[in-house]
Amino acid sequence: MSLIDTRIPEPKRFISGATGDWEVVIGMEVHAQVTSESKLFSGASTSFGAEPNSNVSLVDAAMPGMLPVINLECVKQAVRTGIGLNAQINLKSVFDRKNYFYPDLPQGYQISQFKQPIVGEGKIMISVGPDNKGQFEDVEIGIERLHLEQDAGKSMHDQHPTMSYVDLNRSGVALMEIVSKPDLRSSDEARAYLTKLRTIVRYLGTCDGNMDEGSMRADVNVSVRRPGGEFGTRCEIKNVNSIRFVGQAIEYEARRQIAILEDGGSIDQETRLFDPVKGETRSMRSKEEAHDYRYFPDPDLLPLEFDQAFVDALAVDLPELPDVKKQRLVEKQGISIYDASILVTEKAIADYYESVAAGRDGKAAANWVINDLLGALNKAGKDIEESPVSPEQLGAVIDLIKEGTISGKIAKDLFEIVWNEGGDPKKLVEERGMKQVTDTGAIEKAVDDVIAANPEKVEQAKAKPTLAGWFVGQVMKATGGKANPQSVNELVKAKLGIEE
């Protein structure tokens, strides 16, 4: 990770210590498992959750004489990701051996890329906020590189009281290591960065981003310094597997380092682990330098070379990425940047919204998708793909409101019925007598009844016209939400003698 300072110190990002302000500096190395049916250098399956050691080829097990063969699809996925990160695609890259010993690394080295990665510098834009004024801030974060490498196996220490086991299913699975520049200055920025990166690779289809399955993991480099000072000694927090934990780990680690420095101590450059139960980091080992791994070009693999036409062909087929989609939704659907930002967080959510909004009011569709649908999904712990309410059903609910068939309140009840029981919203309205009351005579009687029952409120409303809203609410309550709200409002004001 290069150590070039590109950010101007911002007081709102500072951390207050006992002896003054401090600034946290964060860089991230994200390991994203490449979406591919087979591994980086073998034909073994990459399926998740298989029986231990059932997805292992002779290459993965490092049997003597077995040679690696590059998986072209993994190369394409890395290039696609590089394009999505607005990065330089290197037409020539080299695979290197990273030498270290660990039981789950059968070769005794990892095939990675060191000096000549497949993807060079790039950038992504993150949105941080909202602040206390409801505003978001766009921050550009530099990408230093993306390189391809093998994953290691998995050591298991909880299967036997005196022995450890090794599962090599993951050994040889293709990873993209995406290295940011040290441009992040808060835990909020780090969370926003990781969220945006996951969104991009999911849109591209190059990684599923499922952190709970280990297909996306983050190594977080944290240091602190006085604002505008030299970079401090950094500690690396390894293999953090959730966006929330990334934020917690940074906040704890920054405070830990500040406390040591303010007490006159110094920071040891080391690798640490985050304990999500205790919410703290703990020392794992001293931090290695590049020379400790004795990198050298892998003699079993030729340099990886392709031409610009190869890159251009992949670029043509890329899907619309979140930033472009967000801008299009703002311009075409007339929704706010805030709403568009929520809708494009997941491609599946954006696709759902666009299906609902097709031929309808974009703002109304956004309100229903964000507030009602996503709220219900979040409460139920479901993903958008598991939604009991289809885009067609939600669109039908919105149509019924626009047509004046049901009121907004009844629409909420109808949504809940469709969520729990399914069915055609239009038929449900007919069958359950949920149609809005548009009979002026019936509405007028309800208004008269409410006014007659509340003479004191009538006098107050004449002095304070805003109390008309209270009468409207009482009428809607009396009619079970079926009365047309606009008709009720007009009648209430007329009866109370309140001018528009």
UniProtKB/Swiss-Prot annotation:
Its EC number is 6.3.5.-. Gene3D superfamilies: 1.10.10.410, GatB domain, N-terminal subdomain (1.10.150.380). It catalyses: L-glutamyl-tRNA(Gln) + L-glutamine + ATP + H2O = L-glutaminyl-tRNA(Gln) + L-glutamate + ADP + phosphate + H(+); L-aspartyl-tRNA(Asn) + L-glutamine + ATP + H2O = L-asparaginyl-tRNA(Asn) + L-glutamate + ADP + phosphate + 2 H(+). It is an enzyme of class 6 (ligase). PROSITE patterns: GATB. InterPro entries: Asn/Gln-tRNA_amidoTrfase_suB/E, Asn/Gln-tRNA_Trfase_suB/E_cat, Asn/Gln_amidotransferase, Asn/Gln_tRNA_amidoTrase-B-like, GatB, GatB_C_1, GatB_Yqey_C_2, Gln-tRNA_amidoTrfase_suB_CS. The keyword Ubl conjugation does not apply. One of its GO terms (biological process) is glutaminyl-tRNAGln biosynthesis via transamidation. SMART domains: GatB_Yqey. It comes from the Bacteria. It holds the Pfam family GatB_N. Keywords: ATP-binding, Ligase, Nucleotide-binding, Protein biosynthesis. The keyword ATP-binding applies. GO terms for molecular function: asparaginyl-tRNA synthase (glutamine-hydrolyzing) activity; ATP binding; glutaminyl-tRNA synthase (glutamine-hydrolyzing) activity. Heterotrimer of A, B and C subunits. Allows the formation of correctly charged Asn-tRNA(Asn) or Gln-tRNA(Gln) through the transamidation of misacylated Asp-tRNA(Asn) or Glu-tRNA(Gln) in organisms which lack either or both of asparaginyl-tRNA or glutaminyl-tRNA synthetases. The reaction takes place in the presence of glutamine and ATP through an activated phospho-Asp-tRNA(Asn) or phospho-Glu-tRNA(Gln). Belongs to the GatB/GatE family. GatB subfamily. NCBIfam families: gatB (TIGR00133), PRK05477.1-2 (NF004012), PRK05477.1-4 (NF004014), PRK05477.1-5 (NF004015). This is Aspartyl/glutamyl-tRNA(Asn/Gln) amidotransferase subunit B. It comes from Brucella anthropi (strain ATCC 49188 / DSM 6882 / CCUG 24695 / JCM 21032 / LMG 3331 / NBRC 15819 / NCTC 12168 / Alc 37).
